[in-house]
């Protein structure tokens, strides 16, 4: 080690000596190196999405599962021709399917943009305005709570204790006369 420089066993030059166990970028410890290689960092913005199960948290289980049978039904004794019923079923199902896809194609990205902006603003306000205001309020209210506590213990406690003692001596006897 000369002039504040350090060369490790692999010939890498460092300005500051490396500790025996290494550092976070180049650990000497084999267990530490394996531990760092095992950790996988996931980024919420680049995670893979499931294209099969698009509602993994079941947000829309009771809302949008509307099939032909949920909307149109013919009671017993009032049936249309079988061909009409089949064509109606196919028309309803295909129209719902493709019209949803068309609306998703036209408005899906703009709505995602709008909702993304909305929730970003909501998160920003919660993090930078709501929580600090609540914390500030709780800090400021502490002095008021101390004054209030002193007031209650000084004036209200003796008053209500005296009133309680007065009313504790009242006795009621009820007799039923025939």
Swiss-Prot record:
Intramembrane segments: 105-125
Keywords assigned by UniProt, alphabetized: Acetylation, Cell membrane, Golgi apparatus, Isopeptide bond, Lipoprotein, Membrane, Palmitate, Phosphoprotein, Ubl conjugation
GO cellular component: caveola; endosome; focal adhesion; Golgi membrane; membrane raft; perinuclear region of cytoplasm; sarcolemma
Origin: domain of life: Eukaryota
Required for homooligomerization, as annotated region: 2-94
Modified sites of kind Phosphotyrosine: 6, 14, 25
UniProt topological domain (Cytoplasmic) ranges: 2-104, 126-178
GO function terms (MF aspect): molecular adaptor activity; oxysterol binding; protein kinase binding; transmembrane transporter binding
Membrane topology: Peripheral membrane protein
Sites of Phosphoserine modification: 2, 9
Stretches for region Interacts with SPRY1, SPRY2, and SPRY4: 149-160
Modified residues (N6-acetyllysine): 5
N-acetylserine modifications at: 2
Lipidation residue positions, type S-palmitoyl cysteine: 133, 143, 156
Post-translational modifications: Phosphorylated at Tyr-14 by ABL1 in response to oxidative stress. Ubiquitinated. Undergo monoubiquitination and multi- and/or polyubiquitination. Monoubiquitination of N-terminal lysines promotes integration in a ternary complex with UBXN6 and VCP which promotes oligomeric CAV1 targeting to lysosomes for degradation. Ubiquitinated by ZNRF1; leading to degradation and modulation of the TLR4-mediated immune response.
Chain segments carrying region Interacts with SPRY1, SPRY2, SPRY3 and SPRY4: 131-142, 167-178
Gene Ontology biological process: caveola assembly; cell differentiation; negative regulation of endothelial cell proliferation; receptor internalization; regulation of cytosolic calcium ion concentration; T cell costimulation
Renumbered residue ranges of the record's region Interaction with CAVIN3: 82-94
Record's subunit section: Homooligomer. Interacts with GLIPR2. Interacts with NOSTRIN. Interacts with SNAP25 and STX1A. Interacts (via the N-terminus) with DPP4; the interaction is direct. Interacts with CTNNB1, CDH1 and JUP. Interacts with PACSIN2; this interaction induces membrane tubulation. Interacts with SLC7A9. Interacts with BMX and BTK. Interacts with TGFBR1. Interacts with CAVIN3 (via leucine-zipper domain) in a cholesterol-sensitive manner. Interacts with CAVIN1. Interacts with EHD2 in a cholesterol-dependent manner.
Family per similarity comment: Belongs to the caveolin family.
Function according to Swiss-Prot or TrEMBL: May act as a scaffolding protein within caveolar membranes. Forms a stable heterooligomeric complex with CAV2 that targets to lipid rafts and drives caveolae formation. Mediates the recruitment of CAVIN proteins (CAVIN1/2/3/4) to the caveolae. Interacts directly with G-protein alpha subunits and can functionally regulate their activity. Involved in the costimulatory signal essential for T-cell receptor (TCR)-mediated T-cell activation. Its binding to DPP4 induces T-cell proliferation and NF-kappa-B activation in a T-cell receptor/CD3-dependent manner.
Name of the featured protein: Caveolin-1
Native species: Muntiacus reevesi
């Amino acid at each position: 080690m000369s002039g504040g420089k350090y060369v490790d066993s692999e010939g890498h030059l460092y300005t500051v000596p490396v500790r025996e166990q290494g550092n976070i970028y180049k650990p000497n410890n084999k267990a530490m190196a394996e531990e760092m290689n095992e950790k996988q960092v996931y980024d919420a913005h680049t995670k893979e999405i499931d294209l099969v199960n698009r509602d993994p948290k079941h947000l829309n289980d009771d809302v949008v599962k509307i099939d032909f049978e949920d909307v149109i039904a013919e009671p017993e004794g009032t049936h249309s021709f079988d061909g009409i019923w089949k064509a109606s079923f196919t028309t309803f199902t295909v129209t719902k399917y493709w019209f949803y896809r068309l609306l998703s194609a036209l408005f899906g990205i703009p709505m995602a943009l709008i909702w993304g902006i909305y929730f970003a603003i909501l998160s920003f306000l919660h993090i930078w305005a709501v929580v600090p205001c609540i914390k500030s309020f709780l800090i400021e209210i502490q002095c008021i709570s101390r004054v209030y506590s002193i007031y209650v213990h000084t004036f209200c406690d003796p008053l209500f204790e005296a009133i309680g003692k007065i009313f504790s001596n009242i006795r009621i006897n009820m007799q039923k006369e025939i």
